[in-house]
C-alpha cells in the first residue's frame, strides 16, 4: 500500500475522507458542543471528499457503520448539515455534482473501459487489491465474517465489513476496471489493519511479510508508480 500512498493523489483523497470518518467517530462518542462541532466538521470533510473523487460517495457506508457501532445517530444531523454546506458552495459556483458524474461515466465507458472487459476485471480488480493490501490483510479479513464476530457486532469487525461492502459495490459499478490498487486506495488503506484480527503472536510475522511483499512488488512488477 505504501507504494501508491507515496506517489498518488488518491492518498490525499484518502486522508481527507479518513479525517472525516475520524471526526464522525469522535462526534458519536463525545457529548455536548464538541460532538456537534465534530459532526459538522466531519460532514464538511466527507462532503468535500466527493468533489475530490466521485467514488468517495461510497464513504457513506462506513460512515453509517461508525454510527451503528457507537449506537448514536445524532451526529448524522450535523454531518448532513456540513456536507450540504459544501454541496451548496460548489453548486453556487456553477458545478452540479451529478452532471459531473454523468459526464465521467460516459467518457469512461466510451473510452478506455471499452478495452477492459468486465468479465475479467470483475475478479482481477480484487487480485490487484490483494497485491496492494498484502496477503496477511487479505487472509485476516475472513475473521471479520466469522459467526462470532457477526453476532457480537464488534466495532473493528464492523468497520472492516463496511469497507469490504464498499469495494464490492465499487466493483459491481463497473467504473473501476484495472488500477484498483490506486483507485481503491481510500478504502483499501483501512483494510491494512485487518491483521489485528489475527493472534498477537503472528503480528510481527505479518509486519515482516507486508514489508517483503511491498519490496517484491515494487522490484518485480512494472507498476508505473
Q: Which residue stretches match the model-derived regions?
A:
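Membrane-interface alpha helices of multi-pass inner-membrane proteins
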Residues: 2-4, 36-54, 60-65, 82-86
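Short acidic/glycine- and proline-prone juxtamembrane loop motifs at membrane-interface regions
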Residues: 4-13, 180
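Hydrophobic transmembrane alpha-helices of multi-pass, membrane-embedded glycosylation machinery
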Residues: 15-23, 57-70, 189
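Membrane-interface helix-loop-helix junctions at transmembrane boundaries of multi-pass membrane enzymes
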Residues: 31-32, 72-77, 141-162, 201
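Signature aromatic-anchored transmembrane alpha helix within multi-pass, membrane-resident enzymes
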Residues: 82-84, 200-224
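Transmembrane alpha-helix segments characteristic
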Residues: 86-88, 151-173, 202-210
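Hydrophobic, aromatic-rich transmembrane alpha-helices
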Residues: 130-154, 166-171, 193-194
Amino acid at each position: 500500500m505504501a507504494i501508491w500512498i507515496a506517489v498518488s493523489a488518491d492518498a490525499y483523497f484518502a486522508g481527507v475522507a479518513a479525517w472525516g470518518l475520524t471526526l464522525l467517530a469522535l462526534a458519536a462518542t463525545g457529548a455536548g458542543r464538541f460532538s456537534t462541532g465534530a459532526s459538522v466538521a466531519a460532514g464538511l470533510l466527507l462532503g468535500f471528499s466527493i468533489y475530490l473523487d466521485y467514488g468517495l460517495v461510497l464513504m457513506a457506508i462506513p460512515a453509517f457503520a461508525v454510527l451503528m457501532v457507537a449506537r448514536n445517530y445524532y451526529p448524522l444531523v450535523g454531518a448532513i448539515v456540513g456536507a450540504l454546506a459544501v454541496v451548496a458552495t460548489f453548486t453556487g459556483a456553477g458545478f452540479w455534482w451529478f452532471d459531473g458524474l454523468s459526464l465521467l461515466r460516459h467518457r469512461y465507458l466510451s473510452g478506455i473501459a471499452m478495452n477492459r472487459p468486465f468479465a475479467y476485471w470483475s475478479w482481477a480488480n480484487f487480485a490487484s487489491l490483494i497485491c496492494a493490501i498484502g496477503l496477511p490483510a487479505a487472509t485476516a479479513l475472513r475473521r471479520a465474517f466469522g459467526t462470532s464476530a457477526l453476532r457480537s457486532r464488534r466495532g473493528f469487525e464492523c468497520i472492516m465489513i463496511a469497507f469490504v461492502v464498499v469495494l464490492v459495490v465499487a466493483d459491481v459499478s463497473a467504473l473501476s476496471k484495472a488500477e484498483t490498487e490506486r483507485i481503491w486506495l481510500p478504502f483499501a488503506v483501512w483494510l491494512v489493519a485487518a491483521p489485528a484480527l489475527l493472534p498477537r503472536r503472528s503480528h510481527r510475522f505479518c509486519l515482516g511479510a507486508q514489508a517483503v511483499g511491498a519490496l517484491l512488488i515494487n522490484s518485480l512488477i512494472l507498476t508505473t508508480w
